[in-house]
Regions:
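Beta1/beta-strand and adjacent pyrophosphate-binding region of the FAD-binding site
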Residues: 1-11
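Conserved hydrophobic helix-helix packing surfaces used for dimerization/oligomerization
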Residues: 4-5, 28, 383
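Membrane-embedded transmembrane-helix bundle of lipid-linked glycan/lipid transferases
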Residues: 6-8, 22, 120
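Cofactor-binding loop segments of dinucleotide-utilizing enzymes, especially the Rossmann-like FAD-
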Residues: 10, 33, 388
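N-terminal Rossmann-fold NAD(P) dinucleotide-binding loop
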Residues: 14
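Conserved N-terminal/central alpha/beta ligand/cofactor-binding core
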Residues: 20, 26-27, 32-114, 168
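Flavin (FAD/FMN)-binding glycine-rich loop and adjacent Rossmann-like elements that form
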Residues: 40, 135, 139-141, 145-422
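Conserved beta-strand-loop-beta-strand element in the redox core of flavoprotein oxidoreductases
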Residues: 116-136
Length: 423
């Protein structure tokens, strides 16, 4: 079997690339290691999609995603105009529907066992493994959207050098049977800051969010409750590092919790399988403490229960490829002019550190424009790396890694490949 384009990884960037390429008429195959598309959204419970100014650059996929989601009542628009309040379960159906509509080939539970680039034929030969069966395919182009650079590793291409800086991981979870009427009244009583704790009445009910972190840069209304829980030994050290709460579209009386922050020692590498596995165990243990904290300290949670724990660890950064251009912190803060822009972004430099002193949230005064070269392998024009593995330094990566940017990266890569094939 021969394809124009094979994409590995059916997360946010991979889906966007597959959908766009197929819509443009390329013979496209999307390969996903699990049994569901969506990655961080559907398996990691990462909702809502964070709002940013993308300047309308490579946003066609996202516009279509909104239209498909409305068919399933899987999307809502929050009071601040953020259209990214999705239902993570229903998006599993939405993504299938989108790819089926554009006749994209999809293989689930499939992984690469070997990949070779043939310089003479200028294409890739790929051996795939599905359960106990094997497949052999060929393709002109590959897009690595695996989040951990699996294809770059197999082909032995370079990554950015490691340093001691690292992002903390998380393991999200949902709590259901929350009395949102009581909880919203409780929030109104303790927090008059509607930027931190916005509350919004919609036709489907109450939508809200709130937050607390161990940083002292904002007047966190939940701070006294976390401090009391620490004193009472209801929470342990670092359980209070980061806590965000959102209601979920189409899930009445359910809230999504962006916590716990999983703290790794300086010498630990999340790519180590033992470190990764221990992080999951630590995360689930701490989820139960945070759940009991909510039941005891937050009004409206008295009869609640844990309804879903993320199926995958929330890793903000595994590795970063070496592309034809490496985007830097300076490029984010003082934007340059580039040809062939892949996406625009004004999301802050957002570093979730292992300790307070290295946390950073630096808002941008200008929108930065990211060139397609950060998505192309430095040594092979036919290999792209998109999503969380884009070519950037540590600080720039923290601003560029969000889901909205990942959607645009996938779309940009697909369009660039289409143009190369047709020229």
């Amino acid at each position: 079997m021969k394809y124009d384009l094979v994409i590995f990884g059916g997360g946010t960037s991979g889906i966007a690339a597959a959908y766009t390429a197929s819509k443009l008429g390329l013979n496209t195959l999307l390969i996903e290691a699990t049994d569901v598309l969506g990655g961080a959204i559907t398996q990691g419970l990462v909702v809502p999609v964070m709002k940013l100014n993308n300047d309308g650059i490579n946003t066609d996929f996202y516009s279509d995603l909104l239209e498909f989601s409305k068919k399933y009542n899987a999307q809502n628009t929050f009071s601040d105009g953020n259209t990214g309040w999705f239902n993570p379960e229903l998006l599993k159906l939405v993504f299938d529907d989108m790819l089926k509509t554009v006749n994209c080939n999809v293989l689930f539970s499939t992984t690469p066992s070997n990949i070779t680039f043939n310089e003479h034929n200028d294409n890739f030969t790929i051996d795939l493994k599905h359960k106990i069966l094997s497949l052999h395919i060929e393709t002109q182009y590959i897009v690595d959207a695996t989040a951990f650079g699996e294809i770059f590793k197999i082909l032995n291409y370079n990554f950015q050098e490691k340093n001691n800086l690292k992002q903390a991981c998380s393991l999200r979870f949902n709590i259901s049977n929350v009395n949102l009427k009581i909880f919203s009244a409780f929030l109104m009583e303790i927090d008059n800051n509607r930027e931190i704790s916005p509350i919004y009445e919609t036709k489907e009910g109450i939508h809200l969010s709130t937050a607390y972190t161990w940083d002292n840069d904002k007047p966190w209304a939940l701070a006294p409750l976390f401090e009391q829980a620490l004193q009472n030994n209801d929470l342990k050290a670092n359980d209070n590092a980061y806590f965000q709460l959102f209601t979920v579209t189409g899930m009445p009386n359910t809230v999504a919790i962006n916590a716990p922050r999983i703290i790794l020692d300086d010498f630990e590498d999340i790519q180590n399988p033992f470190t990764y596995s221990n992080a999951l165990i630590q995360g689930r243990e701490r989820i139960y403490r945070l759940f009991n904290f909510c039941k005891k300290y937050l009004k409206g949670f008295e009869n609640s229960f844990i309804s879903h724990i993320s199926d995958t660890l929330g890793v903000r950064e595994y590795c970063r490829i070496k592309g034809k251009y490496t985007f830097t912190k300076e490029d984010v803060i003082n934007p340059k002019t580039f040809d062939n822009i892949a996406f625009a972004c004004d999301y802050p430099i957002d570093i979730h550190s292992n300790n307070k002193k290295n946390d950073e949230l630096t808002y941008l005064s200008k929108t930065c424009y990211v060139p397609i070269q950060v998505l192309i392998c430095e040594k092979n024009d036919k290999l792209y790396g998109i999503g969380k593995i884009l070519s950037a330094d540590f600080e720039a990566h923290s601003a560029l890694r969000t889901q909205m940017s990942c959607f645009s990266m996938g779309e940009a890569a697909a369009k660039d490949i289409f143009n190369k094939i047709n020229n």
